[in-house]
Structure formats: structure tokens, C-alpha cells
Amino acid sequence: MSVQNVVLFDTQPLTLMLGGKLSHINVAYQTYGTLNAEKNNAVLICHALTGDAEPYFDDGRDGWWQNFMGAGLALDTDRYFFISSNVLGGCKGTTGPSSINPQTGKPYGSQFPNIVVQDIVKVQKALLDHLGISHLKAIIGGSFGGMQANQWAIDYPDFMDNIVNLCSSIYFSAEAIGFNHVMRQAVINDPNFNGGDYYEGTPPDQGLSIARMLGMLTYRTDLQLAKAFGRATKSDGSFWGDYFQVESYLSYQGKKFLERFDANSYLHLLRALDMYDPSLGYDNVKEALSRIKARYTLVSVTTDQLFKPIDLYKSKQLLEQSGVDLHFYEFPSDYGHDAFLVDYDQFEKRIRDGLAGN
């Protein structure tokens, strides 16, 4: 099944939270399962930073949630009707910096406006309106997707029954913002970046590859890397190149990333992570969080090096103090932050129960 596309905000532009407007927004989306007659089994999936509209494939390819989704699995396509879309600012079909600006006939590049999570959620809401979905059984997201799910619960508190937030906090930490800054600088200082207007020339591949390598280290754990590589070396490794196997692994991940992601989208979405503030548009964070009516599942991985346990615990406190019906779980995983994508055994029950409201 191929990705579906729809153009939204073609008559009335989207007013962005930080100023500016966007019109004629293409949204790439995918659906799985069947919407029942009562229309009460719809679930919205919000993807993480570099995800897309296709968490699952039925033709042998690997989606980013391939092992979690399907008939009888945690994301049960026999039970639920899933909707997943690429986020605003992305590069997998939905309008972003690499898209053609209808006013100029050229890619937006440096002219793409600054976006925040609230803008992403507005586009998702417009998609559901287009699809005729007026209520959701649940919204689920991990990492950056968890921030989207959280904002949905604030901005549209009557729209869903359940929220499932995996490995994501209410605020991004100073350390995590620091990681993102280093990654952005790697891209911006690539000689080919050209202020973001590189589409008619050579893209900033070296900078983006380096940024991805650093990002990978924040998604993994020392224990996992030690088990996989230890201090093993490559027989053909150069002294100043990929001498250790872990270096070769990171180089491979950096190069592989270039095949599927745009540098400008990476910069914009990293900044949206940094900037996430659920109180934007409200007087304070407690006023914002107190709007939440959905049953809320929050899952923390104690070995997560990006959204650390202390950040999830602070989020737990804020949600509880705001009167949210919170169900909090934490456990270790060798996979660290990426556990929500790969550690099915640990997450299966929490996802099943969270979607069902059990």
C-alpha cells in the first residue's frame, strides 16, 4: 500500500505559533486496519524525529515499528484503525524545507518558517478532520512523537480517550539541547550548507552524517555498544579512520542516513524538540496540563541517555500535580532510548493496556 497524500490549508493558511503562515500544505499519511461502524477504534500514531508515515509494511520491507504492528500484536491492526502521517517540516512527503514553495517555484530552503510541536499537531488535526475522524480511541508516540501526543491532549482534550507517551518528557533537558546544538553546528558549518539553500548544488552530507553519528550515541547505551562491539578493531581499519568496529558502525549509520533525510528538515525538527513548551499559548504549564482529560500512560526507560529517568520523573510530578489520570511505568533496557522501537517484550503490555485504557 502506497503513501496517501492530501493538500490542506489551501483556502485558509495555517497561522504558525512563532509567526508567519503556511498554505497548500501537503500531508503524507498512511492508514492500517479498518475503521469500525461506530468509528471508535481510531488511533493516531505520532512518529519520532526522523520517522515517517509508514511504521509498518506488509510486503517484506521494514517499517520503523515493524515488529510492534500487525494482526494480534501490540499495535493490533485487527482491533484498531491506525492513522500515521509525516510531520510538518519533515522530508518524507509532508511539506517541509525541501518542498517547492508555491510562491517561488523553488524549494523553501532557508525561507521555510520556524515551527513548533503545536503547529505539527494543528496539521495532524486538519488531516483527521479531512478523514472524517471526530474522536480517537488513543494517541501514541515515542520520543518526539510523545511530545506531539502530550500537546494533543492539551489542545484537544475531548478528542481522545487515551494518551500513550513513550520515552518522552514534558521538557527537553539542557544536556539534550546541548547535544542538538552540536549536531546543528555540524550541519551549519558544512561548506555546502549555503545558509540552507543547497538544493541546486551539493548537499551538506558531511555535516549531516556527523550529526547523525552523535545522535546515534544518545539513542544507544554503553552496555549495548559494549556487547555489540567492545574494543574490537577492524582488520582493514585505518589508524585515523574506522579503526574500531564501533567507529565503523557509526560511520555506516551516518552514511545510511543521507539516503533518507534532508539536512534542513533535521535542523528544523531538532529545534522543535528543543523549543517544546506545552504552556505556549497558556498562562503556565500547570494550566496547560490541567486541560488534559485523557487517561495518560507515561513510560520511562531507566537506561535512556536522551530522555533521562530524572526528566521523566519530573514530568510525572507535573502531570500528577495538574490532576492528570496518570499511569507511570519504568524499566531498564539494553537499548536505551531506542527501546520503544525495538524492545517489544518490555513495551508490549504497556502499549496494549495504554491503547485500550486498561
Curated annotation (Swiss-Prot):
UniProt-reported outcome of changing L306R:
Can no longer use acetyl-CoA as acyl donor, but can use succinyl-CoA
Recorded GO molecular functions are: homoserine O-acetyltransferase activity
Tell me its EC number(s), please.
2.3.1.31
| Domain AB hydrolase-1 as annotated: residue spans | 41-343
Q: Where does substrate bind?
A: R212, D338
Reaction(s) this enzyme catalyzes, per UniProt:
L-homoserine + acetyl-CoA = O-acetyl-L-homoserine + CoA
Provide the top EC class.
transferase
The main location class comes to cytoplasm
UniProt entry keywords in alphabetical sequence: Acyltransferase, Amino-acid biosynthesis, Cytoplasm, Methionine biosynthesis, Transferase
The active site of this protein is located at S143 (nucleophile), D304, H337
**Domain of life according to the entry:** Bacteria
State where the protein is found.
Cytoplasm
Pathway(s) the chain acts in: Amino-acid biosynthesis; L-methionine biosynthesis via de novo pathway; O-acetyl-L-homoserine from L-homoserine: step 1/1
Give me the Gene Ontology terms describing cellular component. Answer: cytoplasm
Q: Which NCBIfam families match?
A: homoserO_Ac_trn, PRK00175.1
Function (record text): Transfers an acetyl group from acetyl-CoA to L-homoserine, forming acetyl-L-homoserine. Utilizes a ping-pong kinetic mechanism in which the acetyl group of acetyl-CoA is initially transferred to the enzyme to form an acetyl-enzyme intermediate before subsequent transfer to homoserine to form the final product, O-acetylhomoserine.
PANTHER family, per this entry? HOMOSERINE O-ACETYLTRANSFERASE
Protein family per UniProt: Belongs to the AB hydrolase superfamily. MetX family.
Cite the record's note on assembly. Answer: Homodimer.
Instruction: Indicate what this protein is called per its UniProt record.
Output: Homoserine O-acetyltransferase
Record organism: Haemophilus influenzae (strain ATCC 51907 / DSM 11121 / KW20 / Rd)
Name of the gene this protein is made from: metXA
